[in-house]
Amino acid sequence: DNYFLVYKDEFCYNKSYSNGYPMGTIKRLNSFDKAVVTTLYICFKLKNNVSINIDYFEQYCESGIFNKELVKIANEGGRAHGLLNVTPTDFFNMHMRIPCIAEQNSIATILVKACKEIELAKEKLANLQSQKRGLMQQLLTGKRRIVEQ
């Protein structure tokens, strides 16, 4: 009873402050088919009859633009155990300005591609760091020697 079942492509607003997210964060479930979250979250899905690109909305949420609206509805000094005092009613009454669907699609395509490139770069960095650790172990313990030419 104290949990919500969230399905793929639905969103959750975490009202907790975390590093880089002073007004909490809105995240899309896209790595799993479903998940369970505490009722402290505000969960929602985009309406079918609204012209909004889900990837655009995800990037919009990630950008922090919503913080300007969240500041208006979060009660001053209304933190309880690190949670912002944001009601679902106030949350769903927030306004957002969005461009036409064609522009949303273009923006989403560019930003999703950029995110994929960043992920590939992170993977490459992790692989290089792993290789370096392996080389350090071999070189610094004498398991591998450098031959002067």
What are the residue ranges of the model-derived segments?
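Short, ligand-facing micro-motifs at secondary-structure edges
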Residues: 13-14, 18-38, 55, 59, ...
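Ligand-binding loop in jelly-roll beta-barrel domains
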Residues: 46-53
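A short glycine-rich beta-alpha junction/loop motif
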Residues: 34-40, 75-102
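Sequence-specific dsDNA recognition surfaces
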Residues: 1-14, 20, 45-46
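Short aromatic/basic micro-patch
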Residues: 5, 51, 85
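Short amphipathic alpha-helical coupling segments at ligand-binding clamshell hinges
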Residues: 53-60, 106-110
